[in-house]
Amino acid sequence: MLLTAPGGTVVQPDGLLVTPSRHVLLEAKGMGRSAFQSEQLSREFACVVRDAGNARPLLLLITPTAPPVPVKGHGRLPVGAAVRLFLVPVLARTSGLNTPLHDLIARIPDTVAWITWNEVQAAVADAHFDAAALPVSVAGTVQRLRDDLLKAIDWHRRS
């Protein structure tokens, strides 16, 4: 859970991956007809840029289909437009982010990326890993995680 400001709006991404060089906020949309909330991408963009520090920020969207993305009350929008849609009011309520609006808007293409569930599934299914180079227990865990992810994507697609 992230906050735009102390006592401010709660931002609840589906995942957060942090390394010394990357700060990745994950937002995964289900296979059904789910839409992003109207301010959601603006909030998540503001939080990932603010919280990245010296790391490179990335807002990674996992979606059922390629953009444009559905935004509640606004139809389907290109990703950049969906981020910009409520960026001004979100920034007014976001503490600790003092970057000028035009600089933030310029950063959207390098900060926001998307991949579809089909592409995730294909990448995982096609990925090769050298099980012989890993301890047996680690190789087994990696294989189980891979298989479980593929099964979960299939299950959600059918649901």
Language model features by range: what are they?
Residues 1-159:
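Charged, terminal alpha-helix-loop-beta segments
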